[in-house]
Amino acid sequence: MGKPSFLCIASYFKGNDFLRGMKSTGATVYLVTSKKLEHKPWAREALDDIFYVQQGPENEWNMEDVAAGLAWLMRSKKIDRIVALDDFDVEKAAFLREHFRIPGMGQTTSRHFRDKLAMRIEARDAGIKVPAFSDLFHDADIARFASTVPAPWIVKPRGQASATGMKKIHSAEELWAHLETLGGERHHFLVEQFKPGDVYHVDALSEGGKVVFARVSQYLDTPFDVAHGGGIFRSAIVPFGSSDEKKLLKMNAEVMKAFGMQHSASHTEFIKNRETGEFYFLETSCRVGGAHLAEMVEAASGVNLWYEWARLEEAVAAPEKYKLPKIRDDYAGIIVSLTRQEWPDTSQFNDPEIVWRLEDKDHHIGLIVRSPRRERVIELLDDYAQRVQRDYHASAPAPDKPTS
């Protein structure tokens, strides 16, 4: 049997390292993306062909048209596996796998990694702690939630990635008024209790239903605060061997098992209740984390999550044994902010610990630092946050829907 053929789906511009990693295995690599992304700098040297879908006004695809196009392509080209490179492509890939009976995650399991309501129900039923929540289907259930669970609450979309579309609510009256504004879209949202706490993320690779690599990090400002308070985004690897790391590695493995994860990258978020110190599951996804967290993980560990995810997918399809690269145990941290300047000059940041700069996105500044000492990483991130706030920072309202 020859090397497998992969159809990669990306409705946003991302995943070039995945495409390169896949091509490095000798696999055939096809990419399907939105027509509006035709002129983005895709890793074309890694592609055997690229196909475009005419997107709708909100970047949606007509999946019946996509299926018809793929059916035509498959008359002459063999497709062995389909991979979604972004959260918003998980359902597309699952639909196509089901329709063409291609191995991989189907539509039911894919909901565990895309639908925030399905995630909470699945986690709760598996005995994993989650914040108190309710669907927004039945008025009496919502009224019961509002009368028994102390405010504040968060109303959040079931399907969006990141903190887009969320609203903090402080009373039952405010909740009902907000649900009125959602109208017929209400069923696409859920409500859950908001408890202040620190938010952590586990970025991992799974093979054969087991987590084979993971790094635990802490957001130094929560994603919600950054998105809605116009803050500065920061994250750092937690201390190795710490109680927090051990608990979160265990919880992450429990989530992956409960949700039916077999093989993929994953990005999973947890919150540590400020009052009790207990961890609660927030959400997960079967993809590499956004906001350049993959670059931070690579700086700390030497593992490029995009590249290794591709190698893992190919090994499963071949089938061959997947082997991780050599892993390093350094500490790393990231800082990213909107800027007033279109192309900010970052030359004032010249510490030897800097290993990465965000240079291809206008009105943004981003830096990753690495050190064998976590204290040094935090010291630098704290210093940089003050300087970014003073010399560069700009804020914009959080969008209702993602823009990239």
For the regions a protein language model found, what residue spans apply to each?
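Short beta-strand-to-turn element immediately C-terminal to the catalytic PLP-Schiff-base lysine
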Residues: 136, 166-171, 205-207, 239, ...
